[in-house]
């Protein structure tokens, strides 16, 4: 028999009854039932009930065991007594009668329990992550993550993609987020950077004659804490293709992402046909460029019904051409209590309130707005929104560029409060036609709105002849349930177009050469049309595991202060290490 086990803790079945077996694992739970000692032994594969009575030669050893001790148990498999089966366990019909116990690794007093999975402070969980990872839910999430990544790889290869690995030590690229810098010992005063993404390398691969690249790529960004991204590093399914259009990217990636979601959806519906929503339409209908399409609410511009109306606040606003009034329909929300609750919520969000109209029996409009604009306009709004008795509509007004974020939050709130959101589906969609540029109010200049290497719709002619803020790019996102899970674009592959695109954003040609010299040189020697995307592995896994916390699907994450509490990073280093790197610290005194 093997030194440590003949079977795993998840393997034993009725067919093993009367066999002598050996299992090893952790003491998950120990119960004393009137002289009978029950030990639930756990390993990576499952859990087996082991039992010792006072007649067992191992009883005294069993009495000494404590939670999370690692032990080896020899014994005989037997049928559980009638009425004690556990249908929740694959091993739930059998137990091991213990004949011998060997302690392989005793455990001290636990800083957090493994059994029971009680809520514990996050910093404790991260400091003792090796204990936290023994807990069933987190352990299963990590296994699911591995299976999802395997599925991605398999499906990418089925689509004809090849996996490549690009460098981890690269040059600093000042655009975007801050880089993690790595000082060079050999080249004093010079630094490598960890890649924020393999963007330039994957484009260089296409210029090197390769096609259909992918990798599960680690990405590093020295960003301030964000609720929707882990500090430090994250992983993406990185993709690039040559001689393709936007349609080719969609055709290649839809089956991959749909297939992964269908495989791990656990009974939830996954739409096989993805809507394609222009960016401007997404913002107007949903108040977000990553709309949650499980929520059926679509906002509408109802400005015409308030222009010149008796509701002077909106009527005066609409005298300014850029201002609009948007309506958020709320099916089933036509109660005074609900409307007052939404108004209070809006005030909590820093707004003066949230105007509303309710419709009662006979489709009669009610509320301050209805009283001010009159029955004819109220009825026109009801018809436009497709509402009836028992429904309500909420209104936001002003410059859409300023209120759109709040409008999106209000749409989400109404949908959730009225239980309109279908929690049993994954609603996937493309968002397309992103603006190439946006106006940076802080710096008073035009900036790239997304990826600076994307191709403008209309090419060089658009860059030369159009208002930059009207130029659309061949850029696209994949959204799911209110999350952006992928982003990509068709690339600028002509050097003159690349230089012009950067010039509009305030970069001179020499600055482009200095910052992106490798790619700029490659453009001079025959660059194919190419494009791709990157899908967020962490977010996809988070959605499929049914959690809203990225730390629940990551092995050893940092906390929100970008600290690894288990390994003690970031840490001080020795003066000798600093001297070797030609670094002198200049820290502010506390």
From Swiss-Prot:
One of its GO terms (cellular component) is cytoplasm. It holds the Pfam family tRNA-synt_2. Its EC number is 6.1.1.23. GO terms for biological process: aspartyl-tRNA aminoacylation. It catalyses: tRNA(Asx) + L-aspartate + ATP = L-aspartyl-tRNA(Asx) + AMP + diphosphate. L-aspartate binds at residues 175, 221, 450, 491. It is found in: Cytoplasm. It comes from the Bacteria. ATP binds at residues 221-223, 484, 536-539. The record marks 33, 83 as: Important for tRNA non-discrimination. Keywords: Aminoacyl-tRNA synthetase, ATP-binding, Cytoplasm, Ligase, Nucleotide-binding, Protein biosynthesis. Residues 199-202 are annotated as: Aspartate. GO terms for molecular function: aspartate-tRNA ligase activity; aspartate-tRNA(Asn) ligase activity; ATP binding; nucleic acid binding. The keyword Cytoplasm applies. Aspartyl-tRNA synthetase with relaxed tRNA specificity since it is able to aspartylate not only its cognate tRNA(Asp) but also tRNA(Asn). Reaction proceeds in two steps: L-aspartate is first activated by ATP to form Asp-AMP and then transferred to the acceptor end of tRNA(Asp/Asn). Belongs to the class-II aminoacyl-tRNA synthetase family. Type 1 subfamily. Homodimer. This is Aspartate--tRNA(Asp/Asn) ligase. It comes from Rhodopseudomonas palustris (strain BisA53). The lineage of its organism: Bacteria, Pseudomonadati, Pseudomonadota, Alphaproteobacteria, Hyphomicrobiales.
